[in-house]
């Protein structure tokens, strides 16, 4: 029987997560806590008896480091890995690098909330969640999903918003539903798919 395994993991806490800054395509590393979260994610996957054939990640350090730390725990450091900006975090444009409280002072609480939580309103010079989906979804359909359907056990380490794009398709969620979905740092979600790419089972290791 083909094991159509897909595991999604948001990167561990980054230095800018800790400082409450908009990060987007900026490239801070992981905090000590973030490193520990990534190692713990690897241990959780190992405890599930999982072995992988292929991995995907973004071009940003925090996701790549998370993947490396997980693979080290799994004893799979040489795993074939594709790195692509399609899996990058949403680009926050002019908000990137700003403290979220400072942004609220500059543009107002309501406007910043709209930029952060609306589906299709981008911040100045940046991407909306809809824009992020527009680059992440084709990559999932063309590159990641075929691996899973071939029975290649697949691990994806990426970002809150690029993973929301994948989850939206996997779980057939509406834009309103996916906006409410919070993804914990370093928390693996294990999917097994049917041959028609629908979800056969889901296990959230954050729970």
UniProtKB/Swiss-Prot annotation:
What Pfam families does UniProt report for this protein, alphabetically? His_Phos_1
Q: Which reaction does it catalyse?
A: (2R)-2-phosphoglycerate = (2R)-3-phosphoglycerate
The EC class name is isomerase
Pathway involvement of the protein, from the record: Carbohydrate degradation; glycolysis; pyruvate from D-glyceraldehyde 3-phosphate: step 3/5
EC number(s) given by UniProt: 5.4.2.11
NCBIfam families to which the protein is assigned, alphabetical: pgm_1 (TIGR01258), PRK01295.1 (NF002339)
Q: What is this protein called?
A: 2,3-bisphosphoglycerate-dependent phosphoglycerate mutase
Gene symbol here is: gpmA
